[in-house]
């Protein structure tokens, strides 16, 4: 998600969305930490994320999304060159500045102008998961970043993990997601995701295909059981 989000975020910026709006979309509306995408990079460190991306590029097979999106866009590469890694260097995508009277201002590093500017507050018209299916630029961003991540996860069983629970727990415990990908899809409604993918002419990821071919509507049932990769 972090790498896909960075590239899809760039596309959104090119279409007119602000970085603050990208952060607002890629946060609590889709069940992710309230920090948002860019602030999460600042927290982890751009230098750390760049190393992870290079590791993806070296070790993942051709065609894997981690390999495709692992390299930073040009503006973020420039930030690395400038030593602009995030909170630990005093600023990455954002920073706090101090005025003479002791008050503080938050500034955003504008990826288009590559200059610092005052941070602005953004309020979304849709502030929940339904944004995934909205035709607005914000909805397109949510679907292309988060929806793509959900579909990517649906292809990882059984190649990376033996079951869907392992992936869900990894994302909830390791990355503070409110729900892992499969629990999230259950909340959204797998049939809605399947319908959207089909309307776009896309092939269903493995676990969504297994679900569609089964007699079940969700990945989990009310007995604490989950769909296996064999159905």
Predicted regions and their residues:
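N-terminal glycine-rich phosphate-binding loop for ADP-containing cofactors
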Residues: 1-231
